[in-house]
């Protein structure tokens, strides 16, 4: 069950409107770099929903971002879905309730449970790293691109098996509390740049739900590494930001890049 919950927790939800706070403690989330003679590609691991209680867009991360000519995210959420009041139902994605998500009601239920657990810890996509970066790029007039189309992500989610959420109120409450605690632990690890804290979770996911792991991590990380390898053939500076879980474990983007003979270095 928890494998599907975690899968939902570290994928890209629709972003909200960022709220800027001052005098927050510094965080140092992991930043990597790939480069050759005329190309620099930064690889940043994001946390899609944060509590806004740390300042992470600073130091090496901000310097790398400001020196980049393009931001590349996992996907670009359509503008009409970025509105705070946009309904988060299948209709909001241009589909009927009984459509591409018809076979994944359980997965949608799981996703709602994950969002609820995150909210209980004050986490919101309004503070998420992807949202902050996208808004900063828009403000700076920086081009923004996606590694995947939004339609591809919807199709992927529609194929993922979900977990049957407990119907008993007491059991559901314990499940929510456990998930909220885990999300808080992962956020803390992200804040301190401890990317390998995500690896045991990924190992558990691969063991319990190999199909989810294959679709969401192994295959996508391979495609993204291939994209980076191709992009190195063009000059320029690019800031690539993907979920931190994709930079951890034996099938990380860095590991996939190594299969192309491409070395990844930690910046911070």
Go through each PLM region and give its residues.
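Sec-dependent N-terminal signal peptides
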Residues: 2-10
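Generic alpha-helix initiation/capping and coil-helix boundary signal
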Residues: 1-2, 130
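A cross-kingdom marker for long, charged
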Residues: 214-268
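Intrinsically disordered, low-complexity proline-rich regions
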Residues: 12-14
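Structured, acidic catalytic/metal-binding patches in enzyme active sites
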Residues: 16-216
């Amino acid at each position: 069950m928890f494998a599907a919950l975690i899968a939902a927790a570290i994928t890209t939800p629709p972003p909200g409107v960022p709220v800027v706070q001052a005098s927050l403690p510094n965080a140092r989330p992991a930043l990597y770099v790939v480069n050759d003679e005329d190309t620099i590609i930064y690889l940043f691991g994001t946390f899609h929903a944060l509590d806004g209680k740390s300042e992470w867009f600073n130091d090496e991360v901000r310097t790398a971002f400001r020196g980049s000519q393009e931001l590349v995210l996992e996907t670009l959420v359509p503008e009409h879905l970025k509105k705070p009041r946009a309904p988060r139902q299948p209709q909001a994605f241009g589909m009927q309730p009984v459509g591409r998500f018809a076979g994944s009601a359980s997965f949608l239920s799981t996703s709602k449970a994950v969002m609820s657990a995150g909210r209980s810890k004050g986490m919101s996509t309004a503070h998420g790293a992807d949202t902050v970066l996208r808004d900063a790029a828009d403000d700076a007039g920086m081009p923004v691109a996606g590694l995947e189309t939004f339609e591809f992500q919807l199709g992927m989610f529609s194929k993922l098996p979900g977990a049957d959420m407990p119907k008993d109120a007491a059991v559901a409450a314990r499940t929510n509390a456990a998930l909220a605690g885990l999300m808080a632990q992962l956020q803390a690890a992200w804040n301190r740049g401890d990317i390998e804290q995500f690896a045991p979770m990924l190992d558990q996911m691969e063991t319990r739900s190999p199909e989810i792991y294959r679709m969401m991590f192994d295959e996508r990380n391979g495609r993204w590494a291939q994209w980076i390898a191709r992009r190195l053939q063009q000059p320029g500076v690019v800031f690539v930001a993907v979920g931190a879980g994709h930079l951890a474990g034996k099938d990380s983007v860095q590991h996939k890049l190594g299969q192309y003979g491409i070395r990844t270095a930690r910046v911070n």
